């Protein structure tokens, strides 16, 4: 079998930068899936992407499918010949359809009889004749939410397509993609190098584009070059560049020939909170801010241009002129906002509707304030020192920064600007920090607040939304979640679990519902919210790699304290790894099945005088021996140690089921043994329903 390297490039108008990686990865995955379905082996495959092109390179691709033999079964011999031994019409028709005579057919004997068969040789198809159709199917599967048409073309794609190149080694693959006929023309950089050139071989794609077209088609190479050059530029300034991967990806998707330059802005702008300046530089301009080693913003920024200029200073000056008005706006907004305190803005929240049925933002902050104070009190009552006055105050001020000029213009600074303005207003540091941290965690992988006041406010903010929206019957359906309730639910669970807060969801939900008063129309709000949170718990732990049966075993106990839930999950996960776990899980399942069949109330008291068999005596004695050790462990939530102790019951339990007839004819003996099993099961149920472990 012969092999060659394949290149496919689709040349387009500028592609959406935030979608570039996804498009390229999807193209590669779908195309290699097509190769696999077509029985075309290959060594490896990579994708390339730049603002005006998507490309895939398949290495070591077979030039044709392998020939194969396909067994085509015909009629049974019993129905293939008549009484005289002549072929029937059915046999003749089958043979004719396969291009043979009945006499040429082979016979296959199976346990169900004897059959006529034909071993048909199927010649493999040349790869080059399959490529275009496979590539088109792969392109059709790209995740394109809003495809577009261009010119008189009925073809749809994410952006207009200008060129298509398909090369198998040096051979041009015939065919069309997206209405464009395959040719050797590759377009270069818009302003540098050759506008277009012909590619002679698939292996020369990257080098020819770089040398002739001034385009670095290797996405990861562009990304690494930008990062390295930006870090070096920042080091020359004595600082560190803020190069978050999301922005780096976007910048790498905007340029074909990245050139990193350094610029500056007036130091007076550093009097504005750095978050607002950074938001402007990163969000609007796609610049990399620079900080000193102490984390203080420097009056410099790093940007990436798509052209190698003879006069880079002109480009630098141009970018400085562009960013200055934005920084001046931030300075103006900050100085204007400082003239009014956050407290003075509370009244204006009455003019903003949070949600039609749930009232205004003023009503919302009043609910958050009371709920945050309640949560802080609950934390205090359970040994976690929290200033409930600060929690209530932070809740009341939590949305006031939404009424400032800065946040209205730079929306992503909400919370952060609240913190800065609170400090200027003389609010306590705990209140100021809580205003910023109320929204945490904002995304998957984000940190959670750790300060107790911040935790109380963050929980209150999320619970108010969750209970309110569920209360008016607008729970998430399918993928739709307009109020981000799933994120809020995960946030609630993470704040409680990661800070080990002794809080009960039932109590928090009940308080939040009471504060909504007449807003609530759903009579099952509390139950619905709790079920939603428990479902999020399951999803969260699954994402962390916890086995489903472990989660279900804990969920069966319906623990409503997330920190306690977490301890149980960790304990059961540990127990699952013990040698005794499989046998004890099976025994618990057997016990559950036996007890489920008992009519009426289960016997609860074990009468030692009725323990007649050595195995049941040994099990009862072991339980009596363990209970004084288990009780304090259950009380302290030390479930892992408790289950480790219970694992010692394995031999006793195995021997019990080996030697003892539970459902004895003697009613007293039977009930006593049922009581023993009830007691055994209850010890495990203090932690989880172990019978659900697989």
UniProtKB/Swiss-Prot annotation:
It comes from the Bacteria. Transmembrane segments: none annotated. The keyword Calcium does not apply. It is an enzyme of class 6 (ligase). It is found in: Cytoplasm. One of its GO terms (cellular component) is cytosol. The keyword RNA-binding does not apply. It holds the Pfam family tRNA_synt_2f. It catalyses: tRNA(Gly) + glycine + ATP = glycyl-tRNA(Gly) + AMP + diphosphate. Its EC number is 6.1.1.14. GO terms for molecular function: arginine-tRNA ligase activity; ATP binding; glycine-tRNA ligase activity. SMART domains: DALR_1 (SM00836). InterPro entries: DALR_anticod-bd, Gly-tRNA-synth_bsu, Gly-tRNA-synth_heterodimer, tRNAsynth_Ia_anticodon-bd. GO terms for biological process: arginyl-tRNA aminoacylation; glycyl-tRNA aminoacylation. Keywords: Aminoacyl-tRNA synthetase, ATP-binding, Cytoplasm, Ligase, Nucleotide-binding, Protein biosynthesis. Belongs to the class-II aminoacyl-tRNA synthetase family. Tetramer of two alpha and two beta subunits. This is Glycine--tRNA ligase beta subunit. It comes from Shewanella frigidimarina (strain NCIMB 400). The lineage of its organism: Bacteria, Pseudomonadati, Pseudomonadota, Gammaproteobacteria, Alteromonadales. The gene is glyS.
